[in-house]
């Protein structure tokens, strides 16, 4: 099985490698550009520019260089269509894309001085050549084509719709119409400003995300990915349904540093899925367990697919606050997934792996202790010392490179061969990190088009009116509409771009319409809500790209794999609905340690009971009425106030005109619900 697993891994890696069609000089050029990009990002994050007073970059120019690298590499590694080779035309487009970005770097001061007025060059007596309009237009078009090649059509279609809406706003339905932006204003705002394509999302990509992806690539090339997987098998391989539990644990550990549930599925699934199949899981269930665990890896602090840093910037809170609130739902969701794998093993009467196939726990743990040092450095600096994410990940990356050097020197008796291996591993890590960032960086930049369109047209305000008109005071309809939009908008996007798109459109809407309906939703709860359901798009058929990746490895049916993964992920889907109403699940309003323990215990019990209900199994198969009882118990445990309010309402509602006849207790809370007419008189 080990040989088979290695063959599968090699085949999948070959199929998904961005450089699979490259050879000779072309491959060397791509590798060189990728390595230079990684070095630039390390320099930008380091304290050296300030120490030497050299090579300092302002925000917008740094973002432009970042996207310039991504666009250049995109056209050098992704052909115009599958089966084609990179042509001279592709190389030309990559140069034009790079120039469109570098123009911002070279002429940044002039752009600031002109305050948004685009430069035109007068030719002859009267003809004006709108040079910046042309550069910006080329930049946007090239970005969209790069997105089509690297990510796919869905995000391109969404971005084009928002661009058309920005320009033709006056022709839109009255409820969302606006005056429309001129072509100059549209291109200038989208390409030459730092509110759209070069806005907060790509700023976070420059500051943090690239380095996290680079950290993951360096860890993988040093052998960290294999170590975590071996450790997972050593810990749980002998348990009932051990390979499934190992897949969950391994995906959780690699998901801590991975920026994509699809990449996570491929990385760990090439090892775990064949072994799950061998021990008795069906093709679809093996793939679905891997998909569910990989998606769960993206909601796990401290990194959360790098979306945690964007979330902190969007909400205006510290990174630590985001991690603190996201911690409990992620942990109990993961424990519930372990429970699912156990229930499946009970259903199928599966045993654990044979002793001979399971690595020795002590030897395995000790063999890779050095991999834990840079991860400890990262978490210690982020969570305990509360340093910035860019500062923390820079020093974690440097510590990883140095720790790997020391390990190889000791392992190879301080020989020159050790230095050679270390240098090669580091260079390959730099190359892989940059190539892995191409799709992520481009997706985030294109998501910036949507952010810019929402900001420049007032669309979020109009969306509030539209959804309020549809949902009225019915919070169920409001949440249903939000979930559907998140699933549609999150199709096929990397985790961070996914969050940027759904949060920019839906977060404000959910807060405002929720308030109008009499519900006060904390901002962090709303952002985590849209983040969770945006991620569910990776699982949910018919798109569910992570399910397709798992099916490619397992040989199963992609649609059946997706449906099974969706069913497994119901526990992840219920949590954001619960924590919108029960804020204690996000550790909001916790008064002391005992209060926290009660919340953690009841939440964990609730999600496990809910999982049993959805899987129809406890110690044995549940009858239909037992499933209903389990669901009621789970809701009571997850949201006690919701159930108590049905029997003992927290508030005694009175009409305003009767308020004078009510004797108010000065020690009790009073809430006023204020309604306002919609633009349509409702």
Task: Please annotate each region the language model reported.
Residues 144-179, 200-201, 222, 226, ...:
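Flexible hinge motifs at transmembrane-helix junctions and intramembrane kinks/re-entrant loops
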Residues 145, 150, 160-172, 183, ...:
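Core transmembrane alpha-helical segments of multi-pass membrane transporters/permeases
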């Amino acid at each position: 099985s080990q040989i088979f697993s290695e063959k599968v891994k090699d085949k999948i890696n070959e199929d998904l490698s961005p450089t699979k069609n490259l050879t000779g000089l072309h491959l060397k050029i791509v590798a060189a550009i990728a390595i230079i990009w990684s070095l630039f990002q390390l320099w930008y994050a380091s304290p050296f520019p300030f120490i030497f007073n050299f090579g300092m970059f302002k925000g917008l120019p740094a973002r432009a260089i970042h996207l310039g690298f991504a666009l250049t590499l995109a056209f050098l590694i992704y052909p115009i269509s599958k089966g084609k080779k990179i042509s001279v035309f592709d190389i030309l487009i990559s140069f034009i894309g790079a120039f469109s970005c570098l123009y911002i770097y070279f002429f940044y001061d002039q752009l600031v001085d002109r305050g948004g007025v685009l430069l035109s060059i007068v030719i002859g007596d009267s003809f004006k050549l709108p040079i910046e309009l042309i550069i910006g237009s080329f930049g946007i078009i090239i970005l969209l084509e790069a997105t089509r090649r690297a990510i796919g059509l869905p995000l391109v279609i969404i971005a084009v719709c928002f661009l058309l809406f920005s320009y033709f706003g006056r022709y839109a339905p009255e409820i969302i119409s606006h005056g429309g932006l001129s072509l100059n204003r549209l291109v200038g705002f989208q390409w030459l400003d730092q509110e759209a394509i070069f806005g907060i999302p790509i700023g976070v990509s420059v500051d943090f995300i690239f380095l996290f992806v680079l950290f993951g690539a360096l860890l993988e090339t040093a052998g960290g990915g294999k170590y975590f997987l071996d450790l997972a098998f050593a810990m749980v391989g002998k348990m009932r349904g051990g390979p499934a539990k190992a897949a969950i644990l391994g995906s959780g550990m690699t998901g801590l540093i991975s920026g994509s549930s699809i990449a996570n599925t491929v990385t760990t699934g090439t090892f775990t899925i064949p072994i799950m199949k061998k021990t008795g899981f069906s093709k679809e269930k093996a793939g679905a367990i891997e998909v569910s665990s990989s998606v769960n890896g993206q909601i796990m602090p401290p990194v959360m697919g790098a979306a945690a840093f964007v979330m902190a910037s969007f909400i205006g809170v510290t990174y630590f606050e985001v991690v603190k609130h996201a911690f409990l739902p992620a942990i109990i969701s993961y424990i519930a997934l372990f429970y699912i794998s156990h229930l499946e093993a009970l259903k199928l009467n599966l045993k654990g792996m044979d002793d001979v196939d399971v690595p020795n726990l002590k030897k395995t743990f000790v063999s890779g202790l050095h991999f834990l040092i840079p991860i400890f450095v990262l978490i210690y600096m982020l969570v305990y010392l509360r340093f910035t994410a860019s500062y923390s990940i820079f020093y974690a990356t440097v510590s990883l490179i140095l720790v790997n050097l020391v390990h190889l020197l000791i392992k190879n008796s301080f020989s020159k061969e050790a230095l050679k291996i270390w240098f090669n591993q580091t260079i390959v890590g730099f190359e892989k990190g940059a190539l892995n960032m191409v799709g992520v960086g481009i997706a985030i930049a294109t998501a910036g088009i949507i952010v810019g369109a929402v900001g420049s047209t007032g669309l979020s305000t109009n969306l509030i009116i539209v959804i309020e008109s549809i949902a009225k005071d019915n919070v169920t309809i409001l949440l249903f509409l939000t979930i559907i939009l998140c699933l549609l908008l999150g199709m096929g996007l990397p985790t961070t771009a996914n969050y940027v798109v759904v949060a920019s459109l839906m977060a404000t809407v959910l807060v405002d319409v929720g308030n109008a309906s009499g519900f006060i939703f904390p901002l962090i709860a709303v952002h985590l809500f849209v983040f969770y359901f945006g991620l569910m798009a990776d699982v949910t058929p018919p798109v569910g790209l992570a399910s397709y990746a798992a099916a490619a490895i397992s040989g199963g049916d992609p649609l059946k794999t997706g449906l099974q993964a969706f069913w497994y992920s119901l526990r992840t889907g219920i949590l954001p609905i619960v924590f919108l109403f029960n804020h204690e699940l996000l550790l909001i309003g916790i008064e002391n340690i005992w209060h926290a323990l009660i919340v953690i215990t009841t939440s964990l019990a609730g999600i496990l009971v809910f999982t049993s209900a959805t899987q129809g199994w406890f110690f044995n198969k549940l009858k239909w009425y037992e499933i209903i009882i389990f669901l009621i118990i789970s809701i009571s445990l997850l949201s006690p106030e919701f159930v108590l309010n049905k029997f003992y309402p927290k508030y005694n509602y009175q009409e305003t005109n009767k308020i004078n006849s009510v004797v108010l207790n000065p020690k009790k809370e009073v809430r006023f619900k204020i309604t306002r007419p919609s633009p349509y008189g409702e």
